[in-house]
């Protein structure tokens, strides 16, 4: 089944700009077949105009992976979420493994949750905010189970063309 899935995905990598988003990346990293293919993709997909995005709530998931060196080397641009525990010895060591120094780890530890993020790349590093306004947040921030339940309740009841207006009134 995985071989078929990999084949179907690779058929879609046709040179058009593509994002391969691996959310909850630990699931993929824990599976030897997936991990091996991800390692291969990290080395080859750039030539096919594919960018790979790993999303995980725990950097330890990546650090413990058998392909951690390939991920760290092939993904030089990273966004770190605020983590007050980042300065604790065990976690600090993990952050250092991603090339962060004491000052950068301190910035991550002091960043305001759900507002500030730390960007790391070869071109530079900085704390940033998305600066989303209330309208954008009404859509981009609607990710809770209750939000999903409400959206599902709208399905089939309202005209899809009216969804944005109805959602904004609800939010």
Predicted regions and their residues:
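Conserved P-loop NTPase motor module
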Residues: 1-15, 79, 106-171
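Conserved P-loop NTPase motor cores
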Residues: 1-104, 134
